[in-house]
């Protein structure tokens, strides 16, 4: 199927909103390509655009029937909530610049979120806990001054108090190799019990599956990125739970009480997926969707990519933005050197499953509680989305099931998983019974093109594997958020695109 650029833009919107089409491509005449880019997420698209701007002929292959990768907006759910790629902050300079280049408006949510400080409810063992009484609660496992910490703030406090080095920007430096241990070992060395770790780290985990499979250096990297953005997202915590709300770009003015001057909690107008869609529309070369890559062959002077339909795409070089969780299922010939091969096959990824619910009526007004919740059960985190016409309008609720909870919920399948979520809501919040509909659900773990959400370094992997992640393999080059070293998330994806573009331009 061949479309011109105007038709491509229109079709991209249709695909994102209806997912009714199976293939999309706008093709140039068949000629020798300079570069094939695998993946139409932020890193792949930015790499392709940069290489085209430098005169190279590029083709982008994407396995899904949409662009964006893990930047995924639900255009058919009120408010267009995000499944992945949630917000940007002041330190997301590359994202802001990419939006400016592509004509995508950045909206600052800080005034709205700080003006709606409803907090969140705390449910433990199926019972609501008054956060004001948590310090003396019989199920509080923490000790000493840490008993004052709510579960979603405990691990942050432990890391801030006990991290053994302060130059967090050098988290990957070999001099810190002795700290490439599990978070579990680190916390127990500082007096934490398994009960503390289970509640304060493993529940609604942000990195990994449990504290056993996350490196302390991974936490240092995450803490560094938090430190960079702390002035932008004051209430961000490792779990994603809020002690207060969140925010967006043009920087916030101090017109709303409690909003720090200059605060940005940014989203892209109409849904964050609008950014990769606009970037894709700027491409000059081919963008082929529904192209599942099964093999990559590389030599010192050329490379080729084979897709599941049997087609072989040839070019002088290949840029691969696939997460290692899916790249490990692709035949690479010749094999990468042993350390890189091991990284491809063992790098960790966090399990995350989301349910997006729409309320028929605002049941939280009936029970007098906040719609947001932090639970130790199947609901995990419940985050209200405020993308309506009014600042106080809640357009949907997002249920975040992370780590072991995400794996547990996935075992039910989609339909039974929906019923599990609705029944758990009704159990904890009786006023919600019959008032909620599951508008969408997505498991990043069972998604064949992601097999997990963001990358996680396991204990020992920073020391052994990190330096090999993005090492060029003949004419095969690597990018993606998992290869970034100075930033994370959407900004990390664009950081990796800068690096890989320079590598390719230097080699050709």
Question: What do these predicted regions represent?
Answer:
Residues 1:
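Flexible coil/turn residues that form the inter-helical turn or adjacent wing/linker of helix-turn-helix
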Residues 4-508:
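FAD-dinucleotide binding site
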């Amino acid at each position: 199927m061949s479309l011109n650029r105007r038709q491509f833009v229109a079709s991209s919107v249709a695909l994102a909103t209806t997912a009714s089409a199976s293939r999309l491509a706008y093709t140039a005449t068949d000629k020798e390509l300079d570069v094939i880019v695998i993946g139409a997420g932020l890193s792949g698209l930015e790499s392709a655009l940069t290489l085209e701007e430098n005169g190279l002929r590029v083709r982008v292959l994407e396995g899904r029937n949409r662009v964006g990768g893990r930047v995924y907006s639900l255009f058919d759910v009120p408010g267009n909530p995000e499944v992945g790629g949630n917000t940007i902050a002041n330190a997301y300079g590359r994202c802001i610049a990419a939006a400016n280049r592509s004509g995508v408006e950045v909206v600052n949510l800080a005034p709205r979120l700080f003006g709606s400080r409803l907090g969140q409810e705390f449910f433990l063992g199926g019972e609501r806990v008054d956060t004001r009484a948590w310090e003396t609660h019989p199920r509080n496992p923490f000790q000493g001054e840490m008993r004052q910490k709510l579960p979603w703030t405990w691990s942050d406090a432990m890391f801030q108090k006990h991290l053994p080095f302060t130059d967090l920007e050098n988290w990957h430096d070999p001099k810190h190799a002795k700290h490439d241990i599990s978070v579990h070992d680190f916390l127990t060395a500082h007096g934490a019990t398994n009960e503390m770790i289970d509640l304060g780290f493993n529940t609604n985990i942000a990195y990994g599956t449990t504290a056993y499979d996350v490196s302390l250096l991974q936490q240092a990297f995450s803490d560094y990125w938090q430190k960079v953005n702390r002035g932008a997202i004051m209430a961000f915590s490792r779990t994603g739970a809020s002690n207060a709300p969140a925010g967006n770009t043009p920087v916030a003015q101090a017109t709303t009480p409690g909003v720090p001057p200059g605060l940005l909690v940014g989203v892209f107008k109409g849904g964050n997926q609008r950014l990769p869609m606009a970037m894709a529309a700027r491409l000059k070369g081919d963008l082929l969707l529904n192209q599942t890559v099964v093999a990559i062959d590389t030599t010192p002077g050329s490379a080729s990519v084979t897709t599941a339909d049997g087609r072989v795409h040839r070019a002088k070089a290949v840029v691969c933005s696939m997460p290692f969780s899916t790249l490990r299922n692709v035949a690479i010939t010749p094999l990468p050197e042993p350390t890189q091969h091991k990284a491809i096959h063992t790098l960790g990824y966090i399990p995350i499953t989301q349910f997006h619910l729409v309320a028929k009526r605002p049941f939280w007004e009936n029970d007098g509680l906040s719609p947001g919740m932090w639970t130790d059960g199947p609901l995990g985190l419940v985050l209200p989305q405020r993308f309506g016409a009014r600042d106080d309008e809640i357009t949907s609720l997002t249920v975040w099931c992370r780590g072991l909870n995400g794996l547990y919920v996935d075992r039910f399948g989609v339909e039974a998983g929906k019923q599990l979520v609705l029944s758990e809501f009704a159990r904890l919040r009786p006023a919600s019974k019959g008032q909620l509909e599951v508008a969408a659900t997505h498991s990043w773990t069972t998604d064949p093109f992601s097999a997990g959400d963001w990358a996680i370094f396991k204990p020992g992997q920073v020391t052994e594997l990190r330096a090999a992640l993005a090492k060029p393999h003949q004419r095969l080059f690597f990018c993606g958020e998992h290869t970034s070293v100075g930033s994370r998330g959407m900004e990390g994806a664009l950081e990796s695109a800068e690096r890989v573009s320079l590598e390719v331009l230097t080699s050709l």
